[in-house]
């Protein structure tokens, strides 16, 4: 070790640099300019990119791919690109929204998806009430008095029906299917120069009311398909027909001189017809646009109508007065249907949403909608089951879906047609517990199953009429014969006939070769 006296002396240098706490804050982000005093293109591009990233980070983009697709469709952009993943699609939407924000001169991402949709939903969900008159109060009380005894009668039969062994039910339904599978084309008749738009079979099964695009309503005999009567009154397309409950049935004492049939037209008029004159007995006026469907209440005292003016209305048949104007749809209402009790009404239309209304209180008790459950295109048809708590909806998306108001959810769905579903009818036969004579018991005292409610029929723009089982939702029969889209379909209560009409201007009659029903 070297002695300190021998070590070389080195003078300490003065401290160099600056302490961290003494470093000044620099808020000047200007990039130094070139010799000409103009920022370089590269520096400008970097600044623009940083600003765009900062703006993009402030824009809220949904994580749900369905909402991402919907927003892209709304902006007129391709919903999906070849090989594009979910994350890529979301990033593409963010980029488009960023560009839109830049064009609008927004710096803080004011056009957020969440804010815009929340505002829209608040507008749509805003609830308001309209005071009803004494006629509406009377109508609601009448429906309470009418529906409660019917509901009691229906549930009593359902309790008895629940005792039927499953094995017996399966065997009985199999027999019904076998008889339906034997249905064939039995007749065809051209009934006008324009497309057939609506067909409805009379309660006695001996006539069918036919409406066409020319505004004509005709009565055609079954099974001959000869024209019996031509009603004159409409000036535009017939889009709704409904028979008065019990009309043409001798035991119901409905006179041919009184109201037997109702029709709705594209000119906005509703006409009530007797069977003894070719001009309307009376007309119901109030809709400002096309009347899409009409249907009598099971009591026959009221008539419901659906219209393109986004409302459905309830009319008093005796006084021809408008009892209720009900809003609730954002677009035209295309279909209405009463349940068998007469307490509920289903409505649906071009907004792809259905609603179940309690006629006794005026409240909506169920909405036929949902991300996975609802329809993605307009709903064209509605019909209730004879059990009173299930309703079918048919849509332009080709699907028929079943909704249970007790569970408040969808309970079944069928990809019924390759094109739009135009019409649909759930079979209610002569053995229906409310509209007919329910089946009794066998020799051992066991309850017999009923045919009513065992199947339903549908028509579509794929030129077919189809028959489906209503328990396992399987296809029973496809009736092909129309050369154009089929616009309407109906059945006879005795199960002998199915009638359809379409754009080929014909009415076609389907049945078994032996002339027997199901």
Enumerate the language-model features and the residues they cover:
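Intrinsically disordered terminal extensions that flank WD40 beta-propeller domains
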Residues: 1-194
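A positional/structural detector of protein chain ends, strongest at the extreme C-terminus
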Residues: 4, 514-518
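WD40 beta-propeller repeat fold
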Residues: 161-328, 335-337, 367-374, 383, ...
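Adenine-nucleotide cofactor-binding loop residues
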Residues: 276, 318, 360, 406, ...
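Hydrophobic, structured segments
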Residues: 341-343, 351-409, 420, 431-435, ...
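Conserved "HGTGT" condensation-loop signature of ketosynthase/thiolase-family condensing enzymes
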Residues: 495
